[in-house]
């Protein structure tokens, strides 16, 4: 009887583990398919919630990280506002009573960008970015709740850790921590098809048109707005003391550090146009080669045959240059023909011809 019970318990444990494993696999597959899929359908307003449910959830997380980094840390460092955020800051300086409407003003300045770029970028990008901005407003409201705000101010303060002047140690610390947290949130948002809004609409359009790194384009645009902010706001503060003290050198340096950190994270998490050499080693190379031709594979590829120096047997491999974010989806297709193939990837620094970007743009 005991043996039967033990057998039953072991079976139940195995069954539960198997169910958990299958669930994890399904979730992982669904998430990867939302990031990039060869068979994805065009996203419309009607099917958006159904096709992008995981992306919506990730945008909630990404907006939380971004808001924590900016609202709690970067705000304490008092760095120069960058991007579209510089415009509501100017309004706040001129009319201090509008400070509490900063988030709404930021949304308002995004509307023209949404209208202008809507025709030229993926609809899912617009939907997810707008949703991400709404989530940012939601988290900002949460952090502004009196009890939470007091707890944050009392807990996250370097004055409790080190007796250093605010314009040195604290600015550096808040900038570094805020840059890392918000940078991860920004990268995560881009990876799942959205962004934090503002100049990201312009970044996405220019990056897609000229096939340039999103991180680099984001840095260039943000730096441009930062310089604009430094010049205009500094002049306003210089001629009218009611607008506050001019920016310090450390605040300006902190701004550039923040932008370097966030764009570094963005490039690392979402290297959209990063090219890789994918080499597939298999005993079914000709079948895979035929499958790629029949399915109208969009990149160039080559079939190589040789003799292994180790086994002295014929070796077959397929080489193709792909974009980094396409790799998982391509390997899934190859696995349908040869489940036990193996592969290697290596970075491509430059190519003589432009690679087809139709699947990722």
Residue ranges of each PLM-predicted region?
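Core subunits and conserved enzymes of cellular information-processing
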Residues: 2-285
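Peripheral (non-transmembrane) domains and long loops of multi-pass membrane proteins
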Residues: 2-42, 270-361
């Amino acid at each position: 009887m005991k043996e039967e019970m033990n057998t039953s318990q072991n079976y139940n444990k195995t069954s539960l583990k198997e169910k958990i494993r299958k669930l994890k696999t399904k979730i992982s597959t669904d998430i990867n398919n939302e990031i990039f899929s060869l068979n994805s359908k065009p996203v419309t307003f009607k099917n958006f919630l159904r096709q992008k449910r995981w992306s919506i959830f990730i945008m909630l997380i990404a907006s939380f990280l971004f808001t924590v980094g900016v609202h709690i840390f970067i705000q304490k460092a008092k760095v120069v506002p960058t991007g579209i955020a510089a415009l509501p800051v100017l309004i706040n300086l001129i009319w201090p009573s509008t400070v509490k409407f900063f988030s709404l003003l930021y949304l308002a300045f995004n509307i023209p960008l949404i209208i202008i770029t809507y025709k030229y970028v993926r609809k899912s990008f617009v939907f997810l970015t707008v949703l991400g901005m709404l989530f940012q407003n939601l988290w900002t409201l949460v952090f502004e709740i009196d009890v939470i705000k007091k707890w944050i101010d009392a807990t996250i303060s370097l004055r409790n850790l080190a007796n250093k002047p605010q314009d040195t140690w604290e600015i550096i610390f808040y900038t570094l921590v805020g840059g890392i947290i918000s940078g991860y949130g920004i990268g995560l948002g881009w990876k799942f098809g959205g962004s934090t809004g503002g100049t990201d609409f312009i970044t996405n359009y220019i990056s897609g048109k000229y096939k340039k790194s999103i991180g680099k384009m984001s840095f260039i645009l943000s730096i441009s707005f930062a310089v604009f902010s430094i010049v205009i706001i500094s002049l306003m503060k210089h001629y009218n003391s009611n607008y506050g003290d001019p920016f310090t050198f450390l605040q300006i340096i902190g701004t550039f550090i923040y932008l370097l950190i966030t764009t570094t994270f963005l490039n690392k998490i979402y290297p959209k146009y990063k090219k890789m050499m994918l080499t597939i080693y298999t005993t079914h190379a000709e079948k895979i080669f035929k499958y790629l031709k029949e399915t109208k594979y969009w990149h160039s590829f080559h079939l190589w045959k040789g003799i292994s120096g180790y086994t002295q047997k014929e070796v077959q491999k397929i080489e193709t240059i792909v974009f980094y974010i396409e790799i998982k989806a391509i390997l899934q297709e190859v696995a349908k023909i040869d489940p036990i193939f193996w592969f290697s990837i290596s970075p491509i620094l430059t190519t003589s011809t432009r690679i087809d970007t139709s699947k990722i743009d």
